[in-house]
Regions:
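Accessory nucleic acid-recognition modules appended to NTPase machines
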Residues: 1-84, 89
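Hydrophobic/aromatic beta-strand patches that form the interior of the parallel beta-sheet core
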Residues: 15, 98, 126-128
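Residues at the starts of beta-strands that form the adenosine-phosphate
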Residues: 68, 123-124
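Residues at alpha-helix caps and immediate loop-helix transition turns in enzyme cores, especially N-
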Residues: 83, 107-111
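Active-site beta-strand-loop-beta-strand hairpin of nuclease catalytic cores
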Residues: 89-97
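Short beta-strand-loop-alpha-helix junction that forms the active-site gateway
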Residues: 100-108
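Arginine/glycine-rich "motif VI" loop of SF2 helicases in the C-terminal RecA-like domain
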Residues: 114-123
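Domain-level recognition of nuclease-like catalytic cores that cleave nucleotide substrates
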Residues: 130-152
Length: 152
C-alpha cells in the first residue's frame, strides 16, 4: 500500500524532534522546579494529559527508524467528533495501524473502528501503552518501549 498516494497537504500534525524541549514547553507556565516535573513524570504522577507527550515520543521513534509519519482521521457518523488513528506504516501490500495511549489501554474506539472499516487492508493493529504485552481480539497490545522494534 502506498501511503504517499493519499497524502493530504492541507491536513498535518506537528511534532517536536527534541522531547526534552517538548516537556519543558508543556510546563513552562507552571511554577514548579525542573527536577520536580521530571520526578513526577517518571513516577506517573504528572498533573497533565500525557497523550501529547507519548504521541510525540512515538513520532520521534518512528522517524528515527527511517519511516515517514502518516495518520488517518475520518468523521464519526452522527457526531461532531472525529476518529483518529495515530500512525500508519506500510508493510508490503498492507498497513500496520498504531494507536498510542499515555496510560492504560482504556478506550480505543478509533483503532477498533479503523480495523472494522479497513480490515482487508490491515496487516496488524497495535495499541501502544505503558501496559504489558497482550491481545484483545485482533488488536495487539504492546508496551511503549517495544515501538522501535515494531516499526523497523
Amino acid at each position: 500500500v502506498s501511503l504517499t498516494d493519499t497524502k493530504d497537504f492541507d491536513s498535518y500534525k506537528l511534532y517536536l524532534s527534541d522531547t526534552g524541549l517538548f516537556v519543558t514547553l508543556m510546563f513552562i507556565d507552571r511554577p514548579v522546579t525542573e527536577n520536580d516535573i521530571y520526578a513526577k513524570l517518571l513516577s506517573d504522577k504528572l498533573p497533565a494529559n500525557l497523550g501529547y507527550l507519548y504521541e510525540n515520543l512515538s513520532a520521534q521513534m518512528i522517524t528515527a527508524s527511517g519511516r515517514e509519519l502518516y495518520y488517518h482521521t475520518w468523521e464519526k457518523k452522527g457526531s461532531t467528533h472525529y476518529y483518529e488513528v495515530d500512525f500508519l506504516i506500510s508493510e508490503g501490500s498492507k498497513i500496520n495501524a498504531f494507536e498510542v495511549k499515555s496510560s492504560g489501554s482504556g478506550k480505543h474506539e478509533s483503532i477498533r473502528e479503523f480495523c472494522r472499516k479497513f480490515s482487508r487492508n490491515i496487516s496488524k493493529a497495535y495499541l501502544i501503552s505503558q501496559k504489558d504485552a497482550g491481545k484483545e481480539e485482533n488488536l495487539l497490545l504492546e508496551p511503549f518501549y517495544l515501538l522501535p522494534f515494531l516499526v523497523k
